[in-house]
Amino acid sequence: MKSISRARPDVTIKFQSVNTRLVCSAGIEMWPRRRKEKSLIESMMAATSQSVVMAMGHGDLNECWRLDQRCFSDGEAYDRETIRYLLSHAQSVCHKVIAPGDQMIAFVVGMIEPDGTGHVVALGVAPEHRRYGHGRRLMYEVEQGFLRRGVSTVRLEVRTSNIVAQRLYLELGYKIVRRMSRYYTSGDDGFLMVKNLA
């Protein structure tokens, strides 16, 4: 085998003079400074409030595989058999975001490793649905799933060139603990990031 690396957040909008403060239950707080930022954040919150996060299982194989192919078109997408294994394994913690129309627009796959560590194996968001907070919501869900199963430490890998993902993980409390030379099949380096949940 190759190496395998539901609750909607409540949204509160509070207006204060020119700026808008937006807070959701996952702890996101934003103070936009410009009208353009305010409009972007409001549209992001509207998009996430119209989508639903739910558990994902073996029945989602084909849709998850297709979305994985779109999200990781750089050659790092998993094959169908690996996705099947991940979704059906007893130690997996998997969630998806469903948009209106029952379309899967994002997913996360976590696995509890033999040493008891939670491993975020894959986090994918459809390109046209990025920057709307779906990745943050899914990370919250997978961490909660790990906690319910007694996991206190979570790890993940991210490309050294993927600054956007690194920023998200750092904001969520992950720390870079090691650089892994030529970790990806493309030859790119990766960072190992770790977070203590307890």
Model-derived regions, located:
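Conserved N-terminal entry element of GNAT/NAT acetyltransferase domains
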Residues: F15, N19-G59, K195
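Short glycine/proline-centered loop/turn elements that form peptide/ligand docking sites
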Residues: M139, N162-A165, R182-G187
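Intrinsically disordered, low-complexity segments enriched in small polar residues
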Residues: S3-S5, S17
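Conserved catalytic core of the tyrosine transesterase superfamily
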Residues: E37, S92, T153-R159, D189-A198
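Conserved catalytic-core motifs of GNAT/GCN5-like acyltransferases
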Residues: E157, L170, K175-F191
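Conserved GNAT acetyl-CoA-binding A-motif
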Residues: F146-E157, M180
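Conserved hydrophobic/aromatic "anchor" residues
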Residues: F72, F107, H129, L168, ...
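Acetyl-CoA-dependent GNAT
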Residues: A55-L61, W65-E128, Y132, M139-E141, ...
